[in-house]
């Protein structure tokens, strides 16, 4: 089902499709891409492939993973951008100007999972860059928890560590999943 959200024109997963499965490029909601959700879906697919042995899905999953990592990565400032418009238009509420903790977590898991399954060094390099960005900009060195988001340039916008969406989930899962993958890679 996740592949149904992949827009073949862009080679990435979008947040929404129309009821008929087509993509609405005429509205901001229809053009929305969330690299964090897409990459979370991709590492779920890799877990499924690993446990089921259905390797037929691997090539497509790896292609979508690398496309999304390249698309979501901020080439100027580093980190995974939280939301993007597939046509490059501004999003409502300047959401593309944030980098939140959980897309970094999901992207790191996806990149490391893809490296494990493919041995493609590009995935390992993405993991290293995402991991370094997250630990540098999102971690509170004084009180061990991560801030919920930073601005596009990595500057902290507030000191919140919890919110309606930020709780004790993505960060521990990221740490545990990456440790698990690293143990398998030893």
Per-region residue spans from a language model:
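Glycan-recognition and catalytic cores of secretory/periplasmic carbohydrate-active enzymes
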Residues: 1-186
